[in-house]
Amino acid sequence: MSASKRDELVQNALKAFYTGGFHAIGMDRLAKETGVSKTAIYSHFRTKDDLILATLRLRDEQFRNWLVRRVEALAKDPKDQLLAVFDALAEWFAEPNFKSCMFIKASSEYQDRSHPVHAISAEHKKLLRDYFTDLAKKAKLKKPEDLARQILILKEGAIVLAHLHDRETVASDAKQAAQILIKTATE
């Protein structure tokens, strides 16, 4: 299988896992949904978990690149960019194929913290927190690490609530809470 076919497999597997879950999608179903035989899948991925890790790496890259681009397009000032995170989330929540966060799902299906799937999910959240810390430092806000952690908590809570039932208002509600946190960090 060529690199482009492998990449296509990872992209199609990402879609299957995102919509169907990790444990619920067996290799037979995955082969059917991706159009790739199990033999071909196993020629590139020793185990299903290896394929899952590849999809999570791809999703991490896609999501963080998308978020940074959207935030930078929505606001220029670092303080405003912290708030623009929630505007970007509102756009994501409005997409018809929104199915929550792949990393929240992965960590809930692989709860053992030492499992590589759980670890890559935790790393994704750490990288987002680092991005928020960087913005808070650029904005010269007080206790930037604490603020970044709080912004991350609001973001993650908004994702869960948007998934459960409240897509229309949850991002703006989280943004209002973030405004209070940022105002406090400014004073």
Across the structure, where does each feature detected by a protein language model lie?
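Hydrophobic alpha-helical segments that form the core
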Residues: K143-L161, A177-I180
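Short, basic, alpha-helical segments at the C-terminal edge of helix-turn-helix-like DNA-binding modules
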Residues: R57-R64
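C-terminal peripheral helix-coil segments that are non-catalytic and often amphipathic
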Residues: K126-K142, L164-E187
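Hydrophobic alpha-helical connector segments
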Residues: A54, V68-E95, K138, A148-I151
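Amphipathic alpha-helical segments used for helix-helix packing
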Residues: E95-P116
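Amphipathic alpha-helical packing segments from all-alpha helical-bundle domains
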Residues: E61, D80, R113-K138, R149, ...
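Helix-turn-helix
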Residues: E8, N12-D50, A54
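N-terminal intrinsically disordered/low-complexity leader segments
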Residues: M1-S4, T186-E187
